[in-house]
Amino acid sequence: ANALLGGTDAVLIFDESGFAKKGEASAGVARQWNGRLGKVDNCQVGVFATLCRGDMATLIDARLYLPEDWCNDDERCKKAAIPEDKRLFQSKTQLALAMLKIARQRGIQFGYVGIDGGYGKEPAVLRGGDKQGYRFVADVHCDQTIYLQDPEPLVPEWSGRGRQPSHRKPQSAPQRVDQWA
């Protein structure tokens, strides 16, 4: 894949897909959002990494999303033949970040990462990728709020009344994407 599609003009795209299911025995099946159907339904969800350049693309990694209820049910996991080391809950964004790290370790070359609004709304994805030195093209929801500069969250000074503050708060106000753009 890297020899044919890798390079600084390539993009590594992350997305998920739902697979409708009737029963409850398939690994990871649950009532959850199925983007292919456009509704919450009984399904499995996979997170996929695709390397693209021009009009060519290939799948380079895929992970089954295992809902937290599944991870906490050893008997159900055994029946579905899920190995013990795979029963640790990871959000879809955590799966995508893990695949991003593995792609780089494998030497996959790409100029930037593309993600849809489901991942673009997650600060952990953008921060995690930014810390690793990646450039992103991220779809975001129009009502998502953003900071144009680091909000420098701090614990506010105690006013002398009520409980003493313990949670950090941003020092600047966020803006909605549709009002900024």
Describe the residue ranges of each PLM region.
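Active-site-proximal, Lys/Arg-enriched surface segment
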Residues: 1-68, 78-79
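An internal, acidic/charged active-site-proximal segment
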Residues: 75-181
